[in-house]
Regions:
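Short loop/turn elements that flank and shape the SAM/SAH-binding pocket of Class I
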Residues: 1
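Mobile active-site "lid"/loop adjacent to the S-adenosyl-L-methionine
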Residues: 4-8, 13-40
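Short, flexible active-site-adjacent loop segments at beta-strand->alpha-helix junctions, enriched
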Residues: 12-15, 61, 103
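Generic structural "secondary-structure junction" signal
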Residues: 18, 86, 113-115
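Alpha-helix initiation/capping motif
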Residues: 30-34, 88, 117
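Conserved Class I SAM-dependent methyltransferase catalytic core
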Residues: 35-92, 96-97
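SAM/dcSAM-binding transferase cores
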Residues: 91-140
Length: 140
């Protein structure tokens, strides 16, 4: 039975590559991924994307170099990179990346979630306003 192709694939994969495991198989499966499984996942993503399809993924900054290497090997091209900073002092927490099969101009940006004093940044509040039942700016 043939598999369909997708215009958009979004993934929030297990975050830890060869990290310290908890000992709980369910938790470990949800949070950890072996490099060879990561590679197969990228190969399958390439197979399932349409020629103009987009692949969005969020990964910890610590896995960024590995992800770039694997996606390059799988002929997925980076077209957008958003670096997420937890605070103005805690830089490079996560990367949201967008890949495609076609080479395109790279867009690079950053988003800081909280200010040093713990308040949400105006940019974060504006970006996520539709997802909250309360006004985050009121909590600032």
């Amino acid at each position: 039975q043939g598999q369909g192709k997708y215009d958009l694939i979004f993934s929030n994969p297990p975050f830890y590559l060869d990290g310290l495991k908890s000992g709980n198989p369910s938790i470990d499966q949800a949070k950890h991924i072996r490099p060879e499984v990561f590679r197969r996942w990228m190969e399958k993503t390439h197979e399932l994307l349409t020629e103009n399809g987009l692949f969005y993924v969020i990964v910890p900054f610590a896995n960024w170099d590995f992800l770039q290497q694997i996606t390059c090997e799988c002929q997925l091209h980076l077209m957008q990179q958003i670096t997420i900073h937890a605070t103005e002092e805690k830089l490079n927490s996560r990367i949201i990346a967008v890949f495609s099969k076609e080479k395109k101009d790279l867009l690079v940006s950053a988003l800081t979630i909280r200010e040093i004093n713990g308040k949400y940044t105006k940019e974060y509040v504006a970006l996520t306003a539709a997802f909250h039942h309360t006004d985050l700016s009121a909590k600032n």
